Amino acid sequence: MAGKPAGLVERLMMKDLLARLNPMRTESAPLVDGAALDRRLAGLAQAADLGDGRLAPASVTGARTVAERAQARRGLSEQLTVVAFAGSTGAGKSTLFNSIVGDEVAKAGVLRPTTSEPLAAIWQETPETLALLEWLGVTRWHVAADGAAALADLVLIDLPDHDSTQSSHRAHVDHFVERVDLMVWVLDPQKYADALVHEQYLRRFARHDDVTVVVLNQVDRLTVADAEACLSHLRRLVAEDGLSDAVVLAASNRSGEGLEALADRILAAVASRRTAVARLAADVATAA
């Protein structure tokens, strides 16, 4: 694809225009039953209570933690969708984040790591958005100057590197991967197969296909054949992690490859207004 693609705002506006020109073409996502989720949450909490003294303490604590965290998220706005970018050192995560936002929000540079604390981009500073940021533990955010109405429901977060030598950076990632609605893992051609991201993160969320995106970034540094080989290998690794239905795509901020596909996936997650519930349903299924 030639030239730099539009940011998320411009991409949404183009999609809105195309929808007006083609009113018969509609897209919809299957709904997740919130009432059914609430019943399963209640059942999980009850099972944890009944398991006290009978089951392994770690299992009881884990189930109770999932139930309490899910109930807390249910108490916040589910029209808001939280999307977080996580990734390895030097993978170009912050640069990709800026490209999607359409503004230089996150710091990107030569010194590593460049992201030391989570940074959010929001398109509307409402009480509901601020309450969600507080629950997430986000203390830094940028309000985008330009935006479309649909983006008011998006909270986009740039996380520190998961493989940073700074323990506080890894702690941030560990905290947020348990709470955000859609995870975008940004990996590079050199480290996409590292055991750390697969064993400590992706495999833990084997039931979270619908709310996981894995990006092989910086493919402009590879030949076409090598990029295809790396992407195929990454897809196989992600499937072995238990995420066979997760979106896996190639991207390059320099060439623009994959950025529109990534923006479309984020926009679809926001428009569906089901991503938060889908994430919680996967959490409960894992804990049950």
Task: Give, region by region, the residue ranges found by the protein language model.
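Conserved G1/Walker A P-loop phosphate-binding module
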Residues: 2-159
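Catalytic cores of large soluble enzymes that bind and process phosphate-bearing ligands
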Residues: 29, 55-58, 168, 226, ...
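Non-catalytic alpha-helical coupling and interface elements of nucleotide-dependent molecular machines
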Residues: 91, 101-105, 123-126, 178-181, ...
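Short, polar/charged, Gly/Pro-enriched helix-capping and turn/loop motifs at alpha-helix termini
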Residues: 110, 190, 276-280
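Residue-level detector of flexible, active-site-proximal loop/helix-junction positions
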Residues: 112, 163, 255
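Conserved C-terminal guanine-recognition region of P-loop GTPase G domains, centered on the G4
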Residues: 125, 132-155, 160-246
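C-terminal end of P-loop GTPase domains and the immediately downstream helical coupling element
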Residues: 171, 219-288
